From Swiss-Prot:
Belongs to the eukaryotic diacylglycerol kinase family. One of its GO terms (molecular function) is kinase activity. The lineage of its organism: Eukaryota, Viridiplantae, Streptophyta, Embryophyta, Tracheophyta. This is Diacylglycerol kinase 1. Pfam families: C1_1 (PF00130), DAGK_acc (PF00609), DAGK_cat (PF00781). GO terms for cellular component: membrane. CDD domains: C1 (cd00029), C1_DGK_rpt2 (cd20805). GO terms for biological process: defense response; phospholipase C-activating G protein-coupled receptor signaling pathway. It is found in: Membrane.
Amino acid sequence: MDDDGELGMFFPSWTSKNPIDTVESRGLMFSCFVAALVGILTIAYTAFQWRRNINLSWTKAIARSKKNPKARHKVPVAPHSWELDPIARAKNLNCCVCLKSMSPSQAIVASESFFHRCTICGAAAHFNCSSSAPKDCKCVSMVGFEHVVHQWAVRWTEGADQTDDSSFCSYCDESCSSSFLGGSPIWCCLWCQRLVHVDCHSNMSNETGDICDLGPLRRLILCPLYVKELTRNPSGGFLSSITHGANELASTALASIRIQSKKYKQTNETSADTGNSGSNCDESTESTADTGPTVNGAHAVLENSISVMNGDSSNGDSDSNGKLEKKPSVKRTGSFGQKEYHALRSKLKYELADLPSDARPLLVFINKKSGAQRGDSLRQRLHLHLNPVQVFELSSVQGPEVGLFLFRKVPHFRVLVCGGDGTAGWVLDAIEKQNFISPPAVAILPAGTGNDLSRVLNWGGGLGSVERQGGLSTVLQNIEHAAVTVLDRWKVSILNQQGKQLQPPKYMNNYIGVGCDAKVALEIHNLREENPERFYSQFMNKVLYAREGARSIMDRTFEDFPWQVRVEVDGVDIEVPEDAEGILVANIGSYMGGVDLWQNEDETYENFDPQSMHDKIVEVVSISGTWHLGKLQVGLSRARRLAQGSAVKIQLCAPLPVQIDGEPWNQQPCTLTISHHGQAFMLKRAAEEPLGHAAAIITDVLENAETNQVINASQKRTLLQEMALRLT
């Protein structure tokens, strides 16, 4: 009892036995809780509005400073490149003209369901405002300027992957992030991504002259000082065509005389340098005679006044098959027929002039239909990091040839393919057709579904790996420091019973499949063609693959498969297992999104060699149905090894589905012959181990040695191939 009295003295409301008091106390507590919650929400809303007003005041301050004649920058005007975007994507965006919010709630009529978005700098504008927008977009050409100058602008988007180090003012080293109480408005350079306070800009401009060094990606960026805008004069088209053709003819003749003179003077040296390339002299003469203008140090393709290559003109080139092993002795960077030359040139707005010999720009190809179809956002992020001129979008009407034509006179450049395995093969085919003396090495940004080639080159299995590697900026830096390796390419000929080709040959980089796996790929391909909107993410793509595979489990379509195909490897007949429902010929160690079919660590098969993507040998395995494919995917089973060899024949005795690198079709009875076609240079992300860094450094040293004419392109190619073989 005494204890109850003491407890009641300390907590009278809790221990009161009066029900009315209890209800009142609970009501009071609930009221206090609601009041506290409302207060917190009010404070949060006030803080949000405060922050929003601060950001808006910053934007207005920057806009006012840009209108100040004394503060205008000496940069050529560049209009925005507008495209339509749904208003749902306008969240947290302000119009770059009226500075009003573009939130979706303000879309009242149907005409306002879209807005204009700049594909280069990310600026947004209302329909009625876009025509009045200031011409302060990224200026891709600064020909005539002595130095690249900063292009200060409002940071309309966060897609530039800002790092912690770049969030400070480049002049005063103070933080550029806004505080709760405000702060100083900032500018962001569209080239180097550095930030500067608007108040600091005048002092910085007086001290440095606003010279921009293009930032940490300067070697990959196509410098605007060397990008020249093409001027077209329709009225003088015929006369200019004649003049242009005469200039080309004179330039080519002069170059031939110089080459012959150089060969006379350096006969012994050339024969020692080229080694066994003498047998290709007739072939090189033939190839240069039947093509249009070719490019090297003296072979000017456009204007004779523009020369972007210097070096020995007697270096090797690729043979008629585009192979890397044997190269003719005439140096050139690319070949185009007259019709193709004029057709490609008409599609370009710019050309490259007087690039320095140590330039290493990156040529980017994007296939926005690959995988999750995120090409638009990826393109805009690349426009922010690089020069928009060096970024090309692939489509059914424009292939890689246009970009390669623009870069045809660049002695050393690298290629980035943003897409899947099919896109990578498309670009490799186009590179091979140009007969580059120094073929560019290719890196892959995995934007497809399986991304098998990207996996074996350490670039990851999807766009999620880009963020895990530190963002797009880090990936671009990894490309600059990547090691060059080689990839075997295989020619697949489709022959009838008489040995005649039924269609042009196809080329394989990853694998070729016949049977159940090709059937699943064909079903997915048809579904994508009918309903492309269903393939909006890499995960959903794999779910659809799994669904189609599950359907095929109950379908015994390939129970007679072992008697419908005959396999021959290096002239030896290979027995197809009776439970086989598919045959796979693999060139790389990744299939169907990361499945290792050969498994080099497996010691069960002692009579087989480890798999390699540049040993000029393919591996043949069998799979026993779609259920087996599913178990391979989760690591519960293994493919059955059948053979290894350099020449494979697969005879189809019945109509069967076939796929090459994920591109499927139904094939009537025929014979598929697979033979080694050549090798392509690829970029492999350097691992953390010292060996990976050493390979990247050696690659850079060899490129510099070729630039300084210590070695020629043929010698560099041979050394790179040898290095790739020894370091694997």
